[in-house]
Amino acid sequence: LLDGEPLQPHHVQYIGYLPEERGLYKSMKVGEQALYLAQLKGMSYSEAKKRLHYWFDKFEIGHWWDKKIDELSKGMAQKIQFVVTVLHQPKLLIFDEPFSGFDPINANLIKDEILQLRDEGSTIIFSTHRMESVEELCDDIVLIHESKKILEGNLDDIKRAYKTNTFEVGLMTERSAVLKQTIEAKFKVSTANFKSLNNDLKLNISLGTNQTPNDLLAFLTAQSQVLHFKELIPNASDIFIQTIKNN
């Protein structure tokens, strides 16, 4: 369904799709091909040309207009295909690995444009294996493994559900071994790292039943100077790996 209606041929003008495998005609010129693809989406020639010049100016690629596609690098061609995907202001956008082939600068440029389209009301389906992109762009996720859906929901809710009440703490101490033993007598310490140069003891500490973050912080403050204290929240990559292992 699109807008509550079964998909019909006229709905194509409301959908933008950027496939992982790009499909530009290599012998055509950039401007010629962009105009052709825009008109396939229902745009008039004049409106397509106006919007194309807007996007080409925005991306500073106006000098590509008369180049042939086979003269462009993979990243350059991908930027053209992104433009023609969003040109007709679709309600639904489907991006399949949109950052493939981009250097970090252009990847950030496209990421910012995707976020802007989201903020302007477009619905975006984003397919990727890059979990850092999921963190940056997605509100809701579906994890698929071996063609089966294994997890679905709001990303923030899922991250809260997967957290383990573990805190990373940094302490200033000249007696790291003694302090570590003192903490271990009351809390579960999973990892420890001591830097003698600045007397910095870093610990990952998990809370037990009926123990609170305030209990831990008060205990640590009584023992040493606390340099930092933060809860460890699993990222999308951690959740993906753990979910696959559990399944």
Please place each PLM-identified region on the residue numbering.
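C-terminal coupling/interaction segments
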Residues: 207-247
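Alpha-helix N-cap/helix-start and coil->helix boundary motif
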Residues: 8, 31, 131, 156, ...
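Short, flexible helix/strand-to-coil boundary loops that buttress conserved ligand/catalytic motifs
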Residues: 11, 162, 244
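ABC transporter nucleotide-binding domains
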Residues: 1-145, 151
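ABC transporter nucleotide-binding domain
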Residues: 112-204
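Generic structural marker for isolated residues within well-ordered, non-membrane alpha-helices
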Residues: 34, 52, 155, 180, ...
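Small/polar loops that bind or transfer phosphate-bearing groups
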Residues: 16, 126, 171, 228-232
